[in-house]
């Protein structure tokens, strides 16, 4: 069964901020590679929504949130029925659990 992945506006904003940072620091090619990698990892959730791991935050885990690691980034998501909602995309070196 294929699930539908919906990237919420907050996650799109996060992705754009990351893209802008990589664009300034390393150029457009690197920025596009990073964004493409993050989106390809998220896309895998269409087939494997349980492939993510628990977050380091008990509250998020209690409410069914999971995360997938995209090299230096993490996507926080929750599956509700047949839809996987992406809530945030953050750098793994930040306190990303405090985004909620």
Language model feature labels by segment:
Residues 5-7, 38, 77, 86:
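Hydrophobic packing within well-folded, soluble alpha/beta domains
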Residues 43-69:
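A short, surface-exposed loop/turn module that caps and links secondary-structure elements
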Residues 4-6, 33, 39, 62, ...:
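PIN-domain endoribonuclease scaffold, especially VapC-family toxins
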Residues 70-100:
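Enriched for short, Lys/Arg-rich terminal
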Residues 1-36:
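Arg/Lys-rich, positively charged N-terminal/basic patches that mediate binding to nucleic acids
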Residues 19, 39-46:
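Structural signal for well-ordered, non-membrane alpha-helices
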């Amino acid at each position: 069964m294929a699930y539908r992945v919906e990237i919420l506006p907050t996650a799109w904003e996060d992705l754009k901020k990351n893209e802008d940072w990589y664009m300034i620091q390393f150029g457009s090619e690197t920025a596009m590679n990073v964004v493409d990698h993050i989106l390809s990892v998220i896309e895998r959730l269409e087939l494997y929504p349980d492939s993510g791991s628990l977050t380091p935050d008990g509250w998020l885990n209690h409410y069914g949130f999971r995360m997938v690691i995209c090299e230096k980034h993490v996507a926080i998501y929750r599956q509700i029925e047949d839809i996987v909602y992406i809530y945030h995309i953050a750098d793994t070196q930040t306190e990303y659990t405090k985004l909620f």
